[in-house]
């Protein structure tokens, strides 16, 4: 997958936006457990009172609290409270740090006031110890004590507070504040309801932000992934179009189709999910760990156990399943190849009654793919149940440990609830990555297969400084001691071929099957590069010209006619779309195609199906010839392109073609000597060597191979 990351450069801005939205979503997601904790701890247990800092308190209460404060604490309280008659009101503009200091000051003092209140055992014991009358207010007695004695009491209290859980100190302070509010006539229930309501509204706002962020990320991710798929398909197409025949033979057609469709789709789907899940999971997981450490560090070992178990499960499953993902894509290629062969070869299969054999062949390819798919899916079905078992086990363990912590006073119920939610978020982040891990290996294999195509070195490339042919020389072909061997082949297919064709000449190539006729003409458009020697067009080596400039000069008609889906008109215009309707008709007339075109209701607008399956072999060849004629090239190349024509049509076509191509060079590969008797030069090939060259008459006089071919096809009267 990493190898294809360069194709995301265009979407860098969108990716940054996605990451920003994911951070926003994670922040809101991680805030919800905190709000839940506060609703339970503060809203329910503390009646909506957040800390020990009262918004308002009586003057008498403040005087009692100040008994247990030092001078600095008294000064800080007086600076942040304003006296209104017999009450003190907290200022509105205090900072968070100041409030924390006040909370610490008030918490200790409130515990002391509660401890030495008139109805407390400790207060009554102190009154009795001091010999004061029964019913004396302990706090009044403390106020009359020397400051040193009070400080000594405070020191003893501080020692006890060190071992006391913070939650107990907080609860004591909050209870004191609630009692003070009730004494002042404030509605504590209203305070509680207001706190819960406002927290709920904030949670709803957070949920709305999460929803909007998730929708936005999904939308943008789909857009980025769609663009990636588009760019990959374009890149594969451009790369494949630049392939020479050597590279085409490296990849099967079925494999190239699979790579540009199924493999790209795999990468596109995973990329869309990766932005939503793979990027989000670590953000959520790391954020959850930070929140857990802030909540309570005594239970983090539970998360360590959970994460360790998850990693072990993932590792084991991947060791088993990963090799199969690679095999899976190969088997898909194989199934596509078999399907394509069967579908394109149905007439032959039926003719030889091989339906059962092909059915078995398809069944084997299908069964192999099914077995591998089942193996992978069976492995992955274990993953989610095991993960859920770990998740539920962690929940039980947290509740068990948390219950003990609550019982000991070291945690509040809300903190336990928050810890569970954070733990679930951390585990869920691993679950999300695990879910992606089912698709990632297969997508990674698909990405590697795509990259294999894109990284393939093209053997035939344009020169850095191309040479342009002279305008004075047109339609000239020269083979100069050309030898050629197919890549990785031991022997030459062509050896030391030399000839020259000038403008207006017709060159025919004849020979037995496998003698190298088609190979020879494939060197002219540079489908292959020669092994030795050179092929020149218009006086320039084809390797020194750009492929476009070279092929613009050629009108090529392959041995097997190839048509494209569209209309007859679009197929004839294929090489030169800008030609007029009159030129289209003229090309069809020369190719003897008007005979069947005019019989169709829609004439030139008649549809042609993919591969030209709705026209006969002869009609396909004539339309292919018309396409080459319409291009008006300097050089015509016919690779046994008249084989599907009857003698009458063949004769009429050659006669019209000779007149039309009198100013162009024509190269014809032929099987029948009768069709090339009038050629200016006939090249005779025998096992890759040039057995002879000349006119029909010259070859009959001095070329034994040509004589054998001629006598096998024509009678003595025809030869004479």
Segments and roles (model prediction):
Residues 1-32, 36-203, 209, 213, ...:
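Membrane-integrated ABC transporters
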Residues 11, 23-31, 204-215, 267-270, ...:
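Hydrophobic alpha-helical transmembrane bundles that constitute the permease/transmembrane domains
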Residues 15-16, 51, 65-67, 71-72, ...:
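ABC-type nucleotide-binding domain
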Residues 135, 146, 153, 245-246, ...:
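An intracellular "coupling" helix at the cytosolic face of ABC transporter transmembrane type-1 domains
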């Amino acid at each position: 997958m990493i190898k294809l990351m360069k194709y995301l450069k265009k979407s860098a801005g969108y990716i940054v936006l996605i990451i920003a939205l994911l951070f926003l979503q994670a922040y809101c997601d991680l805030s919800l457990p905190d709000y839940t904790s506060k609703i339970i701890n503060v809203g329910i247990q503390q009646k909506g009172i957040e800390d020990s800092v009262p918004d308002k308190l009586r003057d008498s209460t403040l005087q009692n609290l100040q008994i247990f404060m030092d001078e600095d604490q008294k000064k800080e309280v007086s600076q942040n409270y304003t006296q209104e008659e017999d009450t003190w009101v907290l200022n509105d503009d205090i900072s968070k740090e100041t409030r924390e200091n006040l909370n610490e000051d008030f918490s200790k003092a409130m515990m002391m006031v509660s401890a030495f209140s008139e109805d407390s055992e400790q207060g009554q014991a102190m009154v009795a110890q001091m010999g004061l009358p029964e019913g004396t207010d302990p706090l009044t007695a403390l106020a009359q004590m020397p400051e040193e004695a009070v400080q000594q009491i405070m020191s003893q209290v501080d020692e006890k507070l060190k071992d006391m859980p913070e939650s107990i100190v907080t609860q004591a302070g909050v209870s004191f504040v609630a009692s003070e509010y009730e004494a002042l006539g404030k509605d504590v229930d209203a305070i509680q309801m207001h706190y819960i309501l406002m927290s709920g509204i904030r949670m709803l706002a957070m949920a709305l932000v999460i929803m909007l962020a998730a929708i936005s990320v999904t939308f943008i991710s789909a857009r980025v992934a769609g663009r990636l798929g588009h760019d990959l398909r374009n890149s594969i197409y451009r790369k494949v179009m630049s392939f020479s025949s050597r590279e085409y033979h490296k990849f099967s057609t079925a494999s190239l189709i699979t790579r540009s469709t199924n493999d790209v789709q795999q990468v596109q789907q995973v990329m869309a999910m990766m932005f939503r899940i793979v990027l989000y999971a670590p953000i959520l997981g790391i954020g959850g760990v930070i929140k857990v450490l802030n909540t309570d560090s005594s239970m983090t070992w539970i998360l360590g156990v959970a994460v360790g178990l998850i990693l072990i499960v993932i590792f084991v499953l991947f060791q088993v399943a990963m090799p199969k993902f690679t095999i899976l894509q190969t088997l898909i290629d194989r199934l596509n190849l078999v399907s394509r062969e069967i579908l394109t070869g149905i007439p032959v299969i039926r003719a030889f009654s091989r339906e059962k054999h092909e059915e078995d062949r398809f069944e084997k390819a299908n069964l192999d793919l099914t077995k591998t798919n089942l193996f992978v899916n069976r492995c992955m079905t274990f993953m989610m149940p095991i993960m859920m078992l770990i998740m539920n086990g962690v929940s039980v363990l947290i509740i068990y440990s948390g219950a003990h912590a609550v019982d000991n006073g070291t945690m509040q119920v809300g903190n336990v609830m928050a810890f569970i939610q954070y733990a679930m978020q951390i585990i869920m982040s691993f679950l999300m990555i695990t879910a992606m891990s089912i698709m990632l290996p297969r997508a990674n294999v698909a990405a590697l297969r795509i990259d294999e195509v894109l990284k393939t070195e093209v053997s035939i490339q344009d020169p850095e400084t191309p040479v342009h042919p002279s305008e004075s020389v047109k339609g000239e072909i020269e083979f100069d001691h050309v030898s050629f061997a197919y890549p990785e082949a031991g022997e030459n297919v062509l050896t030391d071929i030399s000839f020259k064709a000038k403008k207006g000449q017709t060159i025919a190539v004849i020979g037995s099957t496998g003698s190298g006729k088609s190979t020879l003409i494939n060197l002219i458009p540079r489908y292959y590069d020669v092994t030795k020697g050179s092929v020149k067009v218009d006086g320039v080596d084809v390797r020194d010209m750009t492929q476009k400039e070279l092929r613009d000069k050629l009108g090529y008609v392959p041995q097997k006619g190839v048509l494209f889906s569209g209309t007859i008109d679009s197929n004839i215009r294929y090489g030169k779309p800008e030609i007029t309707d009159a030129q289209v008709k003229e090309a069809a007339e020369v190719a003897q195609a008007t005979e069947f075109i005019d019989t169709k209701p829609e004439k030139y607008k008649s549809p042609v199906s993919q591969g030209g399956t709705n026209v006969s072999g002869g009609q396909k060849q004539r339309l292919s010839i018309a396409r080459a004629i319409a291009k008006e090239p300097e050089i015509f190349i016919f690779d046994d392109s008249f084989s599907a024509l009857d003698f009458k049509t063949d004769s009429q076509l050659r006669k019209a073609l000779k007149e039309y191509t009198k100013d162009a060079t024509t190269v014809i590969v032929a099987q029948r000597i009768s069709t090339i008797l009038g050629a200016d030069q006939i090249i005779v090939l025998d096992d890759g060597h040039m057995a002879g060259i000349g006119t029909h008459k010259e070859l009959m006089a001095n070329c034994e191979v040509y004589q054998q071919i001629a006598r096998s096809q024509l009678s003595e009267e025809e030869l004479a």
